[in-house]
Each structure stands twice: as C-alpha cells, then as structure tokens.
Amino acid sequence: MKTKLGLSVCLLFALTLPALAAPATMRLDYYHTGDVSHEVFSVDRVVIEPLPWPGDPAKTIDRTNLGNYFFEVQDAATGRLLYSRGFNSIYGEWVTTEEAKHAHRTFSESLRFPAPEAPVKIVLKERENNQFKEVWTTNVDPKDKFIDTSRPPSPGPLVNIQKNGEPATKADLLILGDGYTAAERAKFENDARRFTDILFGTPPFREHRQDFNVWGLCPAAEESGVSRPSGGVHRRSPLGASYDTFGTERYVLTVENRALRDVASYAPYEFIEILLNNNTYGGGGIFNLYATVAADSEWAPYVFVHEFGHHFAGLADEYYTSDVAYLPPEKRTEPWEPNVTALLDPADLKWKDLVAPGTPIPTPWPKEQFDAMEKQIQEQRRKMRAENRPEAEMNALFKEERKKEEEMLASDKYAKSVGAFEGANYESKGYYRPQENCIMFTRYPSFCEVCRRAIERIIGMYASQ
C-alpha cells in the first residue's frame, strides 16, 4: 500500500510539473568575403529571435557528414559539443564561377542554434579533400549587452498550413511568399497549400506527411512579382529574390539574408521554401539554406520538389546537359552528396546495398542517343531565351523534351535498376547517378531509391518517430 501510494504521488507530481521550457533561438549573422584563392569571415550581429528554439533537444548533433560547410557550437569552458549542422551557402556556389577568379564578393550568412546558458565557441569548418577543415572561430557570450533582443517588424500573420505536433517533435517547413501584394495574400495562401499537397503527394514525403508541420508567412510587396534582370524587370520585393543568379536565367535566389532571416524568425522552422509570384520557369535550392520556385510556372510542381530535394537532403543535380555557371573541379574527388559518385572504387559504391546481383557497374544506358537529343533541345532553349520568346513556347519545348526522354529511357533494359549510370553532377563523363531516371535528372515525377533513402534519413533527424 505504501509503495503504491508513493508511486501515485510521484506520478501526480510528474504530471503537474511544467514541461521544460525550450531555449531561445540564437542567430549569428556574419559576412563571408573572398574570391577563388582566399576568404574572410566577420561577425555582423548576434540576435535572439522572437520564437523559442523549434528543434528536438535530443537531436542536436549532426552525424550525416553532408554539406560543403559545417559548424559547431562548443562550450567555451569545457570544449563540449553542444550543437552542429552541415550546410551549403551561396558563397560556396559563387566561388566556383568564373567571376570568382577576378573579383571579390561579400555574402551575408547565418548560423542558428539553441541559445546557450554560458559562453560558447563557434567553429566553422569547410570541406577540403572530403575532410572538414576549420576556417574560422568566434566566441559568443550570452550575457553580452550587444546581443540584439529587439523584434524585427512583423511580416504579418503566421499561417498554420499543416500542424501535426509541437515543433520540437516535427520537421518544420516554412513557406514564404515573395512578390505578393497585400491584395494577393489569399493567392499566396492558396499557392502555399497547393505546394504542400504537391510535396506530400511525392514519395517518400507522402509516407511521412505526419512528420511535418508546415507554416506560411507572406510580407506584403509594393509591386507584384520579383526581379528578372534578363527580361528588364526589377522589383524591390520584401525578400529580394531574383532570376539570373550567376548569369543563369532560370536560377532564382535571394542574397538579402538579413531580410530573409528577420521575416522567417516569426515562425518555427528548420527548412524554408520561397514561393515567387511569377510565371517564368525558375527556382533554386541550397542545402540547409532555402529553396525557391516560381509559383505560377507550368512546371512549378516539378521544380518545387526537385529544388526541395537539394535544400532538404543535400541531393546533387544529376543532369549534365543544361547550362550552369559553375566551373568543373580541378581535382575529381568523391562527392559528399548521397546520390552521385565519382566511382573511384566501383567495389565500394556508396549505394551498393541497393544494387541487385548481376547489375553491371558502370551500368549501360542509351547515353549517346540521349546526349544528341538534349543537345538539340538546349540549343533551342538558349535561342528562345535570347529572343525573349513567350513562356508558352518554352513550355511546349519542355513538353517535347519530356516526351522524348520518357520514350528513350522507359524501355531500356536497366530502366528500373539501381546501378551507376554515367552522366551526373553537371558532368557528362566521370560522375555517375544511381538510376537511369529520377526527378534530380529529368522532369521525371519521382525520386529514385537512393534519393528516397537520403530524404528519409533527414526526416529522422528532425521528427520523433
């Protein structure tokens, strides 16, 4: 009786205890400056965001070994690792372009982590020869009087698009609108819900919808749409998104990191998707930064899912025939991305457990025929963009391209096999993808087996199963 009573009292006491409050969200904004030969980092500001830390306190350490960059938050007194994450950055992409050979640029970047109780050391590392090398450190004292605790201007009401649980137990996706006027707010909400359904209609997200919360924020724009310099269109949209990033007409990013982070701080999030109020084909995606898509493009469903694959799981582009601004690497090493390989050791293929016995490595496919077809398509595409042809004509070209791709690839002997198919990572030779077709290769509607597994691994980092 005594034991039962004691147990009951303990249980009652536990149930009446308030849940431990989540720590605040601390953000270190910094500048990343350099060119192809050197780089410099400098602190901009340290802020406390308006909302508590949205992550699971039991999942603070990143063991995926993904990203070109990696940061650690260490206790300054003991060196104990408190938090870590891998990520990519706009600077990391820009430095691989021709411009970086003869010019310096500065980009604003941010590191977000649970606010510490005691001083911490921030360690930033960069991947070199597939090892992370320390490139910058700085110290943060949570009692520093210069830490900015002010609240930025509100971007408007937070839209609850899909809530399946508390932020700490789910992967939290924030959908932001850019280029939507106050009168177009209802359009943004409809667009956000439409793309949410598109994402969770695509495996493996479809099977994990319950593991996600989805939120929406849409700061009002003075003018409808975002900038597209190649079309003579310039807008001062709230998030600063623009086509023609690095001179690539379809690549849409924003370099207005401060504005982006201040708006996003009004939602619990780990991942960001920016909907652009435009109909011209375009988008972009950077691992653990954000993804973008032109909401009214006919190909938006494909672009949305493809670019989110980059942002969410660090998936590489598997295509190699479209124009990009990046220069090929001087030295070929094994890519860190989970869905491409240099096949330096065929016996140790990173997805070998998914390869059926008897599948040849490398795996044959009608590459010459495919390359010839794509060469014609890309020549037409460049000509049409140079002539500023109507978007309807571009859509017709893309439909023709997809039809030819499907006819060519669907009937191939290894069309459904996991293997190592040459042509990936923007290179025709020397890099290989896991399956003949995938949404990361063409406008195919789904992910391959390797990409699906990589996505599920990241879901497990943020959602309590």
Where are these regions (language model features)?
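Short amphipathic, basic-aromatic surface patches that mediate peripheral association
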Residues: 23-62
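Short coil-to-beta strand junction motifs in C2/discoidin
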Residues: 57-69, 190-191
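Short pre-active-site segment immediately N-terminal to the catalytic Zn-binding motif
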Residues: 185-188, 283-308
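Active-site-proximal segments of metallohydrolase catalytic domains
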Residues: 211-287
